[in-house]
Amino acid sequence: SNKNFTWTSNFNLTYQRALVDKLPEGKDIQYGDGEMYLHREGESMYTFYLPEWKGVNPETGLGEFWLDPEDHSKGVVNDYSEAGKGIVGKALPDVIGGFSNTFTYKDFDLSFLITYQFGGDMFDYPGYFSHHDGVRIGSMNLSEDVAGNYWKNPGDKVDNPMPIYANPY
């Protein structure tokens, strides 16, 4: 054992559950750009409330959204504004924490910290504008991973719909 050297480690974790307990008159509150967030009794704070993307129709090349995210049997729509909204995730992680080490030798110390989180979702807001099918002309250029990587022919199974200038859908 060296009296000039010490090594200290610390570990912590926190389970968080931030739920909306009560709202005035028990009514949901939608807020944020496009009312994309939802406060609802019993749900997590910062719940994402959005139309749910189904995918690209391989025959038409149009993007499809579920008409009712909570009941897929009601079918799909191509127009984002006609799609029903549903809970598609939450921003808050379930668990957060950290792990640190400190090494000390005489009057010199070296420390590092590693943080982590599990759970929670992320909404790529800039990506909302750069991954489009022509509907947001003039707002931003297409993202590099969309350029050339979209529906071209019937039967194509792709992630990005056919680009249509000033897309009415």
Give short role names for the model-derived ranges.
Residues 9-11, 112:
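Membrane-embedded beta-strand positions of outer-membrane beta-barrel proteins
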Residues 18-92, 109-169:
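Surface-exposed, extracytoplasmic segments of Gram-negative outer-membrane nutrient-acquisition systems
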Residues 5, 93-97:
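Residues that define the transmembrane beta-barrel architecture of outer-membrane proteins
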